[in-house]
A protein has these predicted regions:
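Flexible, P/S/T/G-rich "lid" or insertion loops adjacent to the active sites of thioester-utilizing
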Residues: 17-26, 190-246
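Short, charged/polar, Gly/Pro-enriched secondary-structure boundary elements
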Residues: 76-83
Length: 247
């Protein structure tokens, strides 16, 4: 085992929330990128494997000892090329692709499930239209690192297309991130920042809501609820100037 690191920032909350929940994948984060045009899918698949290897946080493993949770980077873990699915022969390739993604997210993807905590798939739905599906456990990535990994993989793919060398990893080793977090947590700046945000919280108004009824007591889920509304042209013309004034 390499250096053991404590959970930091949002990680302890994510770990505890998953332990308290019986949902199989509520703490997985996923999206897909639509790619239009000619694509060298085997080359992109190789770029995915190399780009994921450059981010050591994606090789993180977790263990709990005497009630304390530790994380460590598995030096032996290597990422293979993601699977490529061709759905052009399906009656509705778009919905078939979405079904593939939903099937992946319906698995038990908890941190202790033994399933891969990072997964990519390239899905072809037309001759020049692809979906690049990406899914991670939230312990591994946050809202910044998720798209940063995507951008690095895309940079590797573009470099290889022009026979340029593989771009170096832009990612800070996670051990350095933990060290910086711990230094900040022990600094006077952390005390000042905490006092500032505590005051901001005390001054916040009640949460805004479009409903007079309280929130229902249902448990959270990984399901997605969508509601689409069409605004009349006249109402939209009235709203547009107001939106521009507050942009």
């Amino acid at each position: 085992m390499t250096q053991r690191l404590p959970l930091v920032a949002a990680q302890p909350g994510i770990w505890m929330a998953e332990k308290l929940s019986d949902l199989p994948s509520a703490w997985s984060v996923a999206h897909y990128v639509e790619l239009n045009g000619e694509l060298d899918a085997p080359l992109l698949a190789k770029a995915v494997a190399v780009g994921m290897q450059q981010a050591d946080t994606l090789r993180m493993r977790f263990t709990e000892e005497n009630g304390e949770v530790w994380q460590w980077i598995d030096p032996e873990h290597t990422f293979g090329e993601p699977p490529i699915a061709d759905l052009r022969d399906q009656p509705d390739p778009h919905h078939a692709a979405l079904a593939l993604m939903q099937a992946d997210l319906r698995q038990n993807l908890r941190a202790d499930s033994g399933k891969p905590l990072a997964f990519h798939q390239l899905i072809r739905i037309d001759d020049t239209r692809w979906y690049w599906y990406q899914r991670y456990h939230h312990l591994l990535v946050d809202g910044f690192s998720f798209p940063a990994i995507t951008r690095q993989i895309a940079a590797i793919y573009r470099a290889w297309q022009s026979d340029a060398p593989t771009p170096e990893s832009p990612f800070t080793p996670f051990a350095d991130v933990v060290e910086e977090y711990q230094r900040y947590h022990q600094s006077e700046a952390w005390q000042r920042d905490g006092a500032f945000w505590a005051q901001q919280r005390r001054e916040l108004p009640p949460p805004a809501s479009m409903s007079a009824a309280p929130l229902p007591g249902r448990s959270a889920s990984a399901g997605i609820l969508r509601m689409k509304l069409s605004a009349p042209a006249g109402a939209f013309r009235q709203l547009a100037p107001a939106g521009g004034a507050h942009a």
